[in-house]
Amino acid sequence: SRLTGVVADVRLLPGGGAMPVHHSQFFRPWRSDGAPRIQAQSCLGKGASEAQSCASALCVAVERYAAAWQGDEAMLLARAAELPAPAITPDMLSFFSAEQRASARPGERAAQRAYDPQTPQAWTPAWSLTENALRYLPLAACYADAPAPWADFAGWSSNGCASGNCREEAILQGLLEVIERDAVAIWWYNMISRPQARCAAAAQARAAQALGPD
């Protein structure tokens, strides 16, 4: 609310050692369709100091709150060809093949449905920083817990979402997170062996602090 703000709680977790970790909590906004949901959401933040860790946990909570779908977001319901500006279509964001969709087994996380250009979608207006122009994105790719049928074709992910003290800082944080997740995914999902990082070889004190004595 306007009185209590977005973040309900921020506290330092015990046992953080050289890298302090803060826990934050926020209450997700009520959906306009009245659908039930778990209201309390937890986040974590880390840093080289307690102040950095606290700020990180605070910003993550604000980021996740802002990403929650409420039902009052700006949107257009149309086919991509009918939009007043180019669209980033669901098939440009999700790279599932027909074979992957056909081979899904019961209990596995389902892939999004194949995008049909003739099916109207819910689109969110966005500003492209690379093109410096208006673009439209699938609403379900921009907000967490967007309802069906829009979420059948696209899904939200926190990867690349970031908040900051200014627009430039938020952009940098989001870019670095995408680079980080992409680098990890390359070796993790391909099960590629990688050498261990040795603390003694760390070039900076902060890297050594993050790695720890072991």
Labelled PLM ranges:
Residues 1-214:
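Helix-coil modules at protein/domain termini and other flexible surface or pore-lining loops
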